[in-house]
């Protein structure tokens, strides 16, 4: 395969809100360029994970190389990166954007600009992308291309008079998109003679080949048989195979500047492939690394514990493999008195957490218990040190803490104006502070500052239900602020259960304590003695529920006779119950853990 001249290469990604049709557009582009035969074509070619097909969302960024004979008579090579649209996978998006020079901004002509469209466009503009707006679903009766054009100009602030109007589903005007790519996006720059500099965009684990890495070549050339070096870790490897995705893997002799492809180098240690690292040649290394992208900082932490303690090592191994494939996921070992050995894991958000849990159970057959998600707090101690708190159970006594800071976010919510009232009420209930409120046509855009702790549990679900699914939501971290926070411990039979403790603002502590106690009362099975369920802040109990004892009629065998006979039996039973209360262990079923942690 000879090298394509730089002027004939276009690297682009597709950015859009969830469900605006970017994976379908990717399918049509692949079809139009004849990369797959009609028999191999299926819907959402690039969403290769079973989970992606099922939920209809893109989780992993995928890449494919297409050849397109344009109207000007030249044959172009197009490298497409399909990116996720959901806020929790923003890290995947930033990686794909770093590897491209331009983007297609897909907007649903019947729905208009959504919050995540906005967030991703700003990321693309930060990466100095040329952006081509595309209006999708123009075949729908509800499509209003003119209104959406005006909206793109007002809200996003990029000219949309030459936006390409298409329908990805029916294939209308796909040619127009390909022409716009070739005409309007810049060609990559690079020098084939310079030392090799390649950005490591992604890596994953293949059962046969070991670790495979996806790179975007900036300068230099990479061929089979080279010895490569990772600039961050200094690890060196012998390249067994270089190739491209057409979407199927196809090996090539070499990759030159501006191209995207994969390397297989028998990499066995997962830790050596840091996404965002620069790959260079061992014998003629580049002087400095490429600017990667900022490492992702986990926002939500939760504990994952194997139900069967023997699966602990298997869980460690599986998490390592997932970490390779998803660089925004972090984990460290921890132990819990109630649940045994497990891991404290960091995620970018709740959907991310759910997807990782689902992938662990599907791809690695693990049965797991997850504890309540919590955010990272900063504790300023009385001795002047600052500590991070990932797990509510580790919070020291209040006397040792000077103050606690909690993370805040800046949330952008876009919603039809008829649902604005309930949305604003929800935000203020969650201690939100309104920053801005603007109207574009019949839609409102509200910008709020909210404590992340209030958003973690079920904010997104509540937002969707009060707006009948119309509201869209996106957020960025917005620093830390001092707050009046307390740890609520849950005691069952006067024993604290560490996996159920959580941190809450003092104003809502009592209400949350009551609701968890009430839930546990319904979920913990009755014993032969009374069980007290309490919520406490320090030593002060703020809520209590009691589960009644199962009654056993010990006097059933007495017919008539003296009362002292019955009294003797009842006293004996009383004595036994007292002893049970002292030594009896209350088993909390797994379903109780899960249900208690879902906040209403």
From Swiss-Prot:
EC number: 3.6.5.n1
Binding site for GTP: 19-24, 136-139
UniProt catalytic activity: GTP + H2O = GDP + phosphate + H(+)
Main localization of the protein described in the UniProt heading: membrane
Organism: Gluconobacter oxydans (strain 621H)
Topology versus the membrane: Peripheral membrane protein
Subcellular location: Cell inner membrane
Protein name: Elongation factor 4
Family: Belongs to the TRAFAC class translation factor GTPase superfamily. Classic translation factor GTPase family. LepA subfamily.
A molecular-function term among this protein's GO annotations: translation elongation factor activity
tr-type G domain segment(s): 7-189
rRNA-binding recorded as keyword: no
InterPro entries: EF-4 (IPR006297), EFG_III/V (IPR035647), EFG_V-like (IPR000640), EFTu-like_2 (IPR004161), G_TR_CS (IPR031157), LepA_C_sf (IPR038363), LepA_CTD (IPR013842), LepA_IV (IPR035654)
Keywords: Cell inner membrane, Cell membrane, GTP-binding, Hydrolase, Membrane, Nucleotide-binding, Protein biosynthesis
Stated role: Required for accurate and efficient protein synthesis under certain stress conditions. May act as a fidelity factor of the translation reaction, by catalyzing a one-codon backward translocation of tRNAs on improperly translocated ribosomes. Back-translocation proceeds from a post-translocation (POST) complex to a pre-translocation (PRE) complex, thus giving elongation factor G a second chance to translocate the tRNAs correctly. Binds to ribosomes in a GTP-dependent manner.
Matching Pfam families: EFG_C, GTP_EFTU, GTP_EFTU_D2, LepA_C
Cellular component aspect of the GO annotation: plasma membrane
Source species, domain of life: Bacteria
Bilayer-crossing regions: none
GO biological process: positive regulation of translation
């Amino acid at each position: 395969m000879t090298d394509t001249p730089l002027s004939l290469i276009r690297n682009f990604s597709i950015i859009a809100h969830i469900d605006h049709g970017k994976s379908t557009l990717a399918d049509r582009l692949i079809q139009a360029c004849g990369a797959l035969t009609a028999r191999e074509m299926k819907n959402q070619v690039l969403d290769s994970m079973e989970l992606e097909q099922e939920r209809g969302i893109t989780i992993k960024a995928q890449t494919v190389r297409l050849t397109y004979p344009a109207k000007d008579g030249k044959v172009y090579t197009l490298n497409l990166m399909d990116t996720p649209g959901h806020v929790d996978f923003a890290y995947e998006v930033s990686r794909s954007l770093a590897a491209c020079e331009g983007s297609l901004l897909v907007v649903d002509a019947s729905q208009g600009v959504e919050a995540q469209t906005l967030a991703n466009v700003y990321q693309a503009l930060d990466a100095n992308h040329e952006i081509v707006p595309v209006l999708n679903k123009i075949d729908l009766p509800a499509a209003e291309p003119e209104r959406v054009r005006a909206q793109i100009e007002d809200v996003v602030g990029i000219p949309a008079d030459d936006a390409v109007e298409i329908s990805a589903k029916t294939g209308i005007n796909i040619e127009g998109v390909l022409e716009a790519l070739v005409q309007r996006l810049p060609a990559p720059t690079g020098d084939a003679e310079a030392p090799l500099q390649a950005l490591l965009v992604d890596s994953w684990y293949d059962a046969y080949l070991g670790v495979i890495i996806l790179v975007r070549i900036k300068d230099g050339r990479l061929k089979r048989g080279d010895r490569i070096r990772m600039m961050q870790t200094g690890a060196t490897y012998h390249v067994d195979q270089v190739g491209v995705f057409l979407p199927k893997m196809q090996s090539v002799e070499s990759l030159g500047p501006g191209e995207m492809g994969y390397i297989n180098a028998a990499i066995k240690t997962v830790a050596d492939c840091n996404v965002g690292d620069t790959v260079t040649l061992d014998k003629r290394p580049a002087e400095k690394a490429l600017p990667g992208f900022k490492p992702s900082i986990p926002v939500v932490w939760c504990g994952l514990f194997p139900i069967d303690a023997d699966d602990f090592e298997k869980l460690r191994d599986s998490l390592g493999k997932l970490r390779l494939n998803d660089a925004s996921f972090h984990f460290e070992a921890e132990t819990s008195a109630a649940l045994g050995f497990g891991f404290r894991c960091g995620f970018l958000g709740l959907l991310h957490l759910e997807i990782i849990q689902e992938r662990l159970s599907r791809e690695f057959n693990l049965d797991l218990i997850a504890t309540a998600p919590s955010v990272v707090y900063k504790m300023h101690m009385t001795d002047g040190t600052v500590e991070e708190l990932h797990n509510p159970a580790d919070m020291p006594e209040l006397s040792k803490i000077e103050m606690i800071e909690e993370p805040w976010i800046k949330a952008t919510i876009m919603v039809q104006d008829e649902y604005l009232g309930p949305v604003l009420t929800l935000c203020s209930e969650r201690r939100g502070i309104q920053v801005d409120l603007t109207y574009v046509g019949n839609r409102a855009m509200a910008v709020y500052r909210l404590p992340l702790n209030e958003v973690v549990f079920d904010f997104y679900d509540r937002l969707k239900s009060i707006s009948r699914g119309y509201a869209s939501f996106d957020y960025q971290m917005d620093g830390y602020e001092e707050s009046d926070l307390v740890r609520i411990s849950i005691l069952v039979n006067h024993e604290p259960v560490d996996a159920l403790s959580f941190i809450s603002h003092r104003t809502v502590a009592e209400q949350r304590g009551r609701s968890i106690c009430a839930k546990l009362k319904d979920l913990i099975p009755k014993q032969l003695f009374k069980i007290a369920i309490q919520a406490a802040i320090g030593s002060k109990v703020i809520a209590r529920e009691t589960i009644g004892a199962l009654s056993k009629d010990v006097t059933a065998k007495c017919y008539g006779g003296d009362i002292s006979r019955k009294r003797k039996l009842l006293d004996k039973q009383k004595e036994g119950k007292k002893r049970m209360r002292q030594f009896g262990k209350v088993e909390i079923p797994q379903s109780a853990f899960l249900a208690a942690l879902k906040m209403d």
